[in-house]
Amino acid sequence: MKPNSKVLIIAGSDSSGGAGIQADIKTITALGSYAMTAITAITAQNTTGVKSIVPIPVKEIFNQILFTAKDIKPDAIKIGMLHSSKVIDAVIKSLESINVNKLVIDPVMVAKGGAKLIDNKAINLLKKKLIKKASLITPNIPEAEILTNTTIRRNEDMIFAAHKLIEIGANNVLIKGG
């Protein structure tokens, strides 16, 4: 990412600041760029786990994306937690209105404490429609296992899972160790 880039983050809010939109804002700002946000859910969480998840209405997610991008055209979009198929549909629809070549998807599915953050219908839609739009997909090991229906224990398993994600339609894959 070039300094002074404008990045739209579409993700959940983490009350502890360790993940989600808060972590993305810190990273983008530290790299000298400008962060904009569209919040998909508000979570009450800390380092020990997730207490609650409050979804933002789909229409408001769509409005946040389009209204922000109408004024400040993003150079890149980073997508995190999309908790339902309706949210994924709204994000796909909004992306069709925004011409951005750099789309990074971090398919947030499981919180560090183990709480599931996305339903099976949404996982299937993510695989069928959204992954192929991404410049880069960055699942962690548990997320890559869910997306590919494989078990990852060794580096070779990560490579196999990355190839399966490319078969699904991903352009580039970075499987994180977490």
Where are the regions a protein language model picked out?
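Conserved phosphate/ATP/ADP-binding segment of small-molecule kinases
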Residues: 120-178
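Glycine- and other small-residue-rich loops at beta-strand/loop junctions that grip anionic moieties
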Residues: 13, 79-80, 115, 176
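Conserved N-terminal subdomain of the carbohydrate kinase-like
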Residues: 2-9, 29-105, 109-112
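Short glycine-enriched, charge-decorated loop/helix-capping segments at active-site entrances
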Residues: 49-56, 115-120, 149-153
